[in-house]
């Protein structure tokens, strides 16, 4: 087993990479932020402010050819994820791709084929599965704490009507579902371990080719599911798992530590509520470390591309129906 740090390269100098994932790579045990590829030296200098040894590659291709890069993180606009993910794999680099991995499930299928051909790890940067709040929710449902599951519902919203923001640009894969729908859909699938049987309904509001609000319902084996996403509403994020014996509520389930404190509330039939509070954990650091253990020690990664594909199938159905 190789014990040397995983040397990471980032394709692009996206603001999220500079403020969140870059610092997470730098802080993670067994990881090193080695290089950033960008045409802008000024943007790369923003990474050097916290990772002094980071090198500047002037093109994505140059970074992928770098023999001193062990893994690649891709925070590019959504419509570029799969193409550059495949190029990274073909260059012999394991790759962590920002969510959503693809524009549709057929794109993810191409990426899965490239992953299998390369024999390397490729995964979606889906950080919530590395947070103890979500891991605890999955365990509590599995051990029967709330009894047989009958319904799941979720909500994720924030307000952003800036036409210049990538979330509001159709050509690059903008819209609320791709940005935050992955969480209310994928989170339900992660905790329950199930895939939906069918789409029951979808109502989608559109502005300039991007979905700004979506309300959706799915039927699963033994339980129903409802959620909404909005990028034109005041901030809200919650997940609820309704069982025959109790209700499990996850507060601040998607931006723990930023939006609010991560808690898990268990409401039981005797009218008691048990609250579990989770310490502040950087789920992005946890994600980087888990990816490193997967490629260095062969540990199973919690969110493989097949999981991303399952969420994308749900998203594709809502977008098509709406």
Region locations from a protein language model:
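Active-site loop of classical SDR/Rossmann-like NAD(P)-dependent oxidoreductases
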Residues: 16, 258, 276-289
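Hydrophobic residues in well-ordered beta-strands that form the structural core
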Residues: 17, 58, 97-98, 122-124, ...
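C-terminal helix-rich "cap/oligomerization" subdomain common to oxidoreductases
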Residues: 1-5, 71-73, 290-322
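Contiguous beta-strand/loop segments that form the cofactor/metal-binding neighborhood of enzyme cores
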Residues: 185-257, 288-299
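Beta-loop-alpha module in the N-terminal Rossmann-like domain of NAD(P)-dependent dehydrogenases
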Residues: 54-114
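N-terminal Rossmann-like dinucleotide-binding module
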Residues: 1-51
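Rossmann-fold dehydrogenase core element
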Residues: 109-127, 148-150
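Predominantly a Rossmann-like dinucleotide-binding segment in NAD(P)-dependent oxidoreductases
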Residues: 128-200, 207
């Amino acid at each position: 087993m190789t014990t040397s740090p995983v040397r990471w390269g980032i394709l692009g100098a996206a603001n999220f990479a500079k403020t969140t994932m870059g610092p997470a790579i730098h802080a993670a045990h067994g990881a090193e932020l080695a290089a950033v590829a960008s045409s802008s030296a000024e943007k790369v200098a923003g990474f050097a402010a916290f990772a002094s040894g980071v090198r500047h590659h002037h093109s994505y291709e140059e970074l992928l050819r770098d023999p001193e890069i062990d893994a690649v993180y891709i925070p590019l606009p959504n419509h570029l994820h799969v193409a550059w993910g495949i190029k990274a794999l073909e260059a012999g680099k394991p790759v962590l791709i920002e969510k959503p991995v693809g524009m549709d499930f057929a794109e993810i299928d191409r990426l899965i084929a490239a992953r299998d051909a390369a024999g390397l790890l490729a995964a979606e940067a889906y950080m919530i599965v590395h947070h103890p709040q979500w891991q605890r929710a999955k365990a509590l449902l599995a051990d029967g704490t709330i009894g047989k599951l009958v319904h799941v519902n979720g909500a994720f919203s924030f307000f952003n009507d800036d036409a210049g923001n990538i979330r509001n640009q159709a050509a690059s894969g903008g819209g609320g579902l791709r940005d935050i729908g992955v969480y209310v859909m994928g989170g339900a699938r992660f905790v329950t371990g199930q895939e939906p049987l069918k789409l029951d309904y979808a109502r989608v509001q559109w502005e300039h080719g991007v979905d700004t609000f979506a309300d959706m319902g799915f039927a699963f084996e033994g339980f129903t599911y409802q959620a909404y996403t909005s990028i034109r509403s005041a901030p809200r994020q919650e997940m609820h798992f309704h069982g025959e014996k109790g209700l499990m509520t996850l507060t601040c389930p998607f931006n723990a530590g930023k939006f609010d404190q991560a808690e898990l509330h268990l409401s039981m039939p005797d009218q008691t509520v048990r609250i579990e509070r989770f310490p502040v954990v950087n789920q992005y650091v946890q994600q980087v470390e888990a990816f490193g253990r997967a490629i260095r020690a062969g540990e199973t990664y919690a969110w493989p591309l097949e999981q991303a594909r399952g969420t994308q199938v749900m998203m594709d159905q809502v977008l098509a129906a709406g």
